[in-house]
A protein has these predicted regions:
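N-terminal alpha/beta PP-like core and its mobile active-site loop of ThDP/TPP-dependent enzymes
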Residues: 1-341, 379, 383-386, 466-471, ...
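Active-site nucleophile and cofactor-binding loops and adjacent substrate-binding regions
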Residues: 24-26, 45-55, 70-77, 132-133, ...
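Phosphate/pyrophosphate-binding active-site segments
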Residues: 135, 195, 205, 296-394, ...
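Conserved short loop/turn motifs at secondary-structure junctions
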Residues: 213-217, 366, 446-448
Length: 572
């Protein structure tokens, strides 16, 4: 079959089973867009900004496990997408991003809408390609999907000069069924000797803790993780990115850990003698002061990426491999042992954890007339019966959502963890809703974050996406204000958002339903009404207490055991 370069791109997407492409056209990709116009198998979603395309593809990938696909033009189209690409890279999200490029003969001449996309994106992609021949295009696309979805996932970018997709240049189409790359061979299983060594240490542990991250979600390893945790009766804590891999309602779950994790999770981490890290990378928001991190623990680290092991924290038993397979192998080894874990020690350990739990570290003051953001998230959980896909932006509202919306399933909590990208929530929700048209999708955001990509409300109308936007409006860049209160003697430099639009009218101007709530007693009814409109996007502006802070909080430079638990508390 003879195809042009533009037709090859579309045919490759069909052969990869891609159903949705999120993009924005421009001169360098018009040949590809013309090929898209002539077919119906791959649906194109027209966003209103290229950053939105990348975030939507990201949300699609996080909620499905399939690679998200974005298509943007050269120059500013590509640079606008960089924030979304970097967001995906930091959280190891599989994406393939197609960027247009100026024609090959004028590359390097500062041609119109030329940018060094390969150079610009090299630090924030798993790999990138500049296509130099139309004959190489199909194989390059196959490599991109393979690299993006295997090993530690991540975004892969393909930069395509306009002449490569010229409809007058047709070549024989041959899409490879398999790809072999000598320089890229991700491991398929963990070392059995290391697994047995780890189990030997775990069965002797007196104060063990599972510390699990986004890698468990990415590898669809929730079931073997849950099976292993319950077989051993060990406590488990999860990172912001790992929530839902083990059920939030599960009896072994001791809460999220880290800067805004629970008291019991952080104290258990500090006191543990055996730490089993699974698909987590020991980032600074988890460890606190590295020299004080898990001071008495032997550390077992399971990760698909060997470069993550002992990168931030030195580990005792490294296991390189896909976490799903490693966890299955660990459970098999556990079941083969004649002697199980130390039950007497575990009983004492759980008693200590229960004492920490009794601190009730997530309690908040319910007095006063203003709506508390924590309460708003609790109402959201109640109204959606805990069964929504929840996207968020970045800031206090993100932490409140993580703390108070109990996630019992993986891939339901969609947020930017590593890069912390404001503006992520709404376009990510678009990707989620396109992937799950019949599901309930809620975007928890703030008056600061939502305005970063608010133009995507038009995309929602164009494709009839019934997303529910829950805006926790406190009139501030909340997390910035909180840090200024704690560490800058309440000098709120440029963190106030005193001038914002009327979000109800703004939503209505985009063709959606807008609502505003200021009283606690009216919140549940308003939220019930909003979620009752199954076929409409509803923008719910919830005015919340501007003085509310996120607790617990580990202060910068402190250890995990040094937390503020309330406005009145000192470090504990």
């Amino acid at each position: 079959m003879e195809l042009s370069g533009g037709e090859i791109v579309v045919q490759c997407l069909k052969d990869e089973g891609v159903e949705h492409v999120f993009g924005y056209p421009g001169g360098a990709v018009l040949h590809i867009y013309d090929a898209i116009f002539k077919q119906d198998a791959v649906k194109h979603i027209l966003v209103r900004h290229e950053q939105g395309a990348a975030h939507a593809a990201d949300g699609y990938a996080r909620s499905t496990g399939k690679p998200g696909v974005a298509l943007v033009t050269s120059g500013p189209g590509a640079t606008n997408a960089v924030t979304g690409i970097a967001t995906a890279y930091m959280d190891s999200i599989p994406m393939v991003v197609f960027t247009g490029q100026v024609p090959t003969p004028v590359i390097g001449s500062d041609a119109f809408q030329e940018a060094d996309t390969i150079g610009i994106t090299r630090p924030c992609v798993k790999h990138n390609f500049l296509v130099k021949r139309t004959e190489d295009l199909a194989e390059t696309i196959k490599k991109a999907f393979y690299i993006a979805t295997t090993g530690r996932p991540g975004p892969v970018l393909i930069d395509i000069p306009k002449d490569i997709t010229d409809p007058g240049n047709k070549v024989t189409y041959d899409y490879p069924k398999k790809i072999k790359m000598r320089s890229y061979n991700p491991v398929s299983k963990g070392h059995l000797g290391q697994i047995k060594k780890a189990i030997g240490i775990m069965l002797k542990a007196e104060r063990p803790v599972f510390y699990t991250g986004g890698g468990v979600v990415l590898d669809n390893a929730a079931k073997p993780l849950t099976d292993l945790v319950e077989a051993l009766d060990f406590p488990i804590t999860q990172t912001l990115m790992g929530l839902g891999a083990y059920p939030g309602s599960g009896k072994h779950f001791i809460g999220m850990l880290g800067m805004h994790g629970t008291y019991e999770a952080n104290m258990a981490m500090h006191e543990t003698d055996v730490l089993i890290a699974v698909g987590a990378r020991f980032d600074d928001r988890v460890t606190g002061h590295v020299k004080q991190f898990c001071p008495d623990a032997k550390i077992i680290h399971i990760d698909i990426d060997p470069s993550s092991i002992s990168k931030n924290v030195r580990v005792d038993v490294p296991i390189v491999g896909p976490v799903k397979q490693v966890l299955r192998d660990m459970l098999k080894v556990v079941n083969e042992q004649k002697k199980g874990p130390n039950k007497e020690a575990l009983k004492k350990w759980w008693a200590q954890i229960d004492k920490w739990r009794s601190m009730d570290c997530l309690k908040y003051d319910t007095k006063g007339k203003m709506i508390k953001p924590q309460y708003a998230v609790e109402v959201l959980h109640k109204v959606t019966k805990g069964d929504a896909f929840v996207t968020s932006d970045v800031g206090q509202h993100q932490m409140f959502a993580a703390q108070f919306y109990q996630f019992d399933k993986p891939r339901r909590w969609i947020n930017s963890g590593g890069l912390g990208t404001m503006g992520f929530g709404l376009p990510a929700a678009i990707g989620v809703q396109m992937a799950h048209p019949d599901a309930t999708v809620a975007c928890v955001t703030s008056e600061s974050s939502i305005q970063m990509c608010i133009q995507e409300l038009a995309t929602c109308l164009q494709y009839d996406l019934p997303i529910k936007i829950i805006l926790l409006n406190n009139g501030f860049m909340g997390m910035v204000r909180q840090w200024q209160e704690f560490f800058y003697e309440s000098r709120y430099s440029q963190s106030g958002m005193s001038v914002t639009p009327d979000f109800v009218k703004l939503a209505e101007s985009y063709g959606h339903v807008g609502m505003r709530v200021e009283k606690s007693e009216e919140l549940e009814g308003a939220m019930q009404e909003a979620f009752g409109m199954k076929d409409r996007l509803v923008f719910l502006d919830v005015v919340v207490d501007p003085a509310e802070n996120v607790y617990p909080m580990i202060a910068a430079g402190k250890g995990q055991h040094e937390m503020y638990l309330s406005p009145e508390s000192e470090l504990v």
